[in-house]
Amino acid sequence: MMNKSILLMGTLLVSASVEIAAQKNSENPNIVFVLADDMGIGDLGCYGQKKIKTPNIDKLAEKGLLFTNHYSGSTVSAPSRCSLLTGKHTGHAYIRGNKGIKSEEGFFDLHLPSDEVTVAEILKRKGYATMCVGKWGLGGPHTTGSPVKKGFDYFFGYLSQGAAHRYYPEYLYENEDKVMLNKKVYSHFLIMEKGLDFIRKNAGHPFFAYFAITPPHADLDYPDLSQYEDAFPETPYINNKQKGFKTQMKPKAAYASMVSEIDKNVGQIIQLLKEKGILENTIIIFSSDNGVHCVGGHEPDFFDSNGPYRGYKRDLYEGG
């Protein structure tokens, strides 16, 4: 059994759908899909979280639909994203694990073949502008699995899911070209900036904005821990090896900060949609790719991150 993932849909899913059904000439709704990385169902206030503040997502849940029987496609990143974008059960999907392959440009995940159709390709045929920012994980640059060859007009972020463990990367990809950051930029901030800019530029016609953001996946790395710095008893996570996750002296504060950052981002998206006058014609969906992780210093039991369910990421139980 797979993870009960987090899926929230705003009230506008219902209102927009009803209006479109009633009026043949209605404008197609915009679609915003925010996919968190390794977030547990219990990490949000609307699912019972008491220690981490998520007011924007909680409000979205209050006014929308709260899914309690929705399962992710897999217990790890790449196959879950493959199922999400192709609509296929993992048993029929092309990508069924986080297996990677080497190329001249680096180490990337298995790439989707040309005959695999994504939801972005379908929406693009219907006149949608399409975007993916964040983690891709379904193929490297200049392959059939590149996002710009799978229906996305614009991509910015990590093409390799394995590279997305580092929040201060050497580079990110814009479409299929490297953008050098030299390990000096917190990637998530730049990824969100690019995604919001896409909405600004495309507010005049239907769009599909897929925010495949990387928090709260380990590394537990966030530049400002002040919101939760002294809120919890901490057990430092120390890794002196060259491989593995980054040392974090306050892992609980870091994890909570990353979850609250995601909540802030959802608020930013909603505010921008309001400013552009398109909120009432936009479907907003929030989910996680799989269950909560328990690496890099994160203690899921402290936050009750998996809620009432058994297991964590990689486990074949509903918490994973």
For each of these PLM feature ranges, what is it?
Residues S26, D38-I52, T68, S72-T75, ...:
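Active-site-proximal cap/lid insertion segments
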Residues Q23-P29, D58, K63:
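N-terminal carbohydrate-binding accessory modules
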Residues P29, Y128, F152, N281-T282:
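Local beta-strand N-terminus motif with an aromatic residue
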Residues M1-S26:
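Bacterial Sec-dependent N-terminal signal peptides
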Residues I41-M131, K150, Y154, S160-H165:
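Active-site segment of extracytoplasmic enzymes that catalyze sulfate/phosphate-ester chemistry
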Residues G134:
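Catalytic cores of carbohydrate-active enzymes across secretory and cytosolic contexts
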Residues N30-V34:
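Amphipathic alpha-helical repeat scaffolds
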